[in-house]
Each structure stands twice: as C-alpha cells, then as structure tokens.
C-alpha cells in the first residue's frame, strides 16, 4: 500500500514532500496542487492529521469589508402597485369582510363575566376611624384576627411600650412552659426493642 511521508513543518522546504515509489508509479494518482505534489490514495477508516485537498474557507458572516451601494432616492412620490378595481368588486369585498368578522360584543362574551382578582383585598382589614392604629406597638406582630372585643379594646388602650413593663398579648405563648407538662406530652409508647440477629 502506498504511504505518504511528510517532513516536519519547521524543517520543511518547498517541494520536500516525499511519496513512496508505489505512489509515484501511478500517474493518475499524482496531482499537482499549488506547486506541490500530493498523492491521492484511498483511505480506509479514520485518518488523523492526514492532509486532504485544500478546502475553501467558510465565511460565517458572508463577505466582510464589502462596500454596499446605497439605494438612490428618487424624487417621485411612491405609487401603489395594486391594479385598479372597479366599484362593483370593491363593494363585494367589503360585504364579504363585514359578514365574516363577528361583532365586537359577540367575540368574547366570557370577558363580561370576568371579575378582577386582587390578592391585596384579602390582606387589608378595615377598622373604624375612632381606633388609631398608629399608637399601637405593632412591630413583630403576626397578622391575625381577634374575635374577642375585650382583647381588641385592651390592645387599643395600651400605653407606649416601656422596658420595665411588658404587656401580655393574647397571641403570645408562655415562653417558659412548665417542664412536667412538656414531658408528659412527649411520653409515647414505643414498640419493644427487637434484638434478633435475623433481621
């Protein structure tokens, strides 16, 4: 089989590509490309780094640095290129378009049944004007509704907060629950311990 021998590019001199004797004997197999000899032999399988025929480079952006001609503006007014239609044809077309398009009221009847949804409506609470919320210490208070009027009146008549006296608010839980009550809630019967080695 004919093999090609190539000289390293650093040491390459013009015309230094060599081919085997079998390749040189085949007259049809030798082609002159750009002043260099190259043997075209059939290759089987993948060939890595083997030189092929020179390919034209692909232009990704088309022609670069090409001067394009600017369209010449004419001083004539633009004319429509539509052919002139008779009055009869125009009236026929207008009646067809009017009959095919539905009336704007009939187009979307479900829009009239649409109710706009505002999520803030569910988070706003209306209070009577006589209650002043600005006097309440509401920092860190969760959003909740109090059903008891006594608790609401108690909240509305609070004095400004003081570091010595902290009012008990109904939504707060006891910060230090009694240990026996907490432990009694944790008493749960567990299944018996199984020491079998089979499991």
From Swiss-Prot:
Primary residence: cytoplasm
Protein name: Securin
Subcellular location: Cytoplasm; Nucleus
Residue numbers of N-acetylalanine PTMs: 2
Disease: Has strong transforming capabilities on a variety of cell lines including NIH 3T3 fibroblasts and on athymic nude mice. Overexpressed in animals suffering from pituitary adenomas. The transforming capability may be due to its interaction and regulation of p53/TP53 pathway.
Modification sites for Phosphoserine: 162
Tissue note: Expressed at low level in most tissues, except in adult testis, where it is highly expressed. Expressed in both spermatocytes and spermatids.
Compositional bias per record (Basic and acidic residues), positions renumbered to this chain: 7-23
Organism lineage string: Eukaryota, Metazoa, Chordata, Craniata, Vertebrata
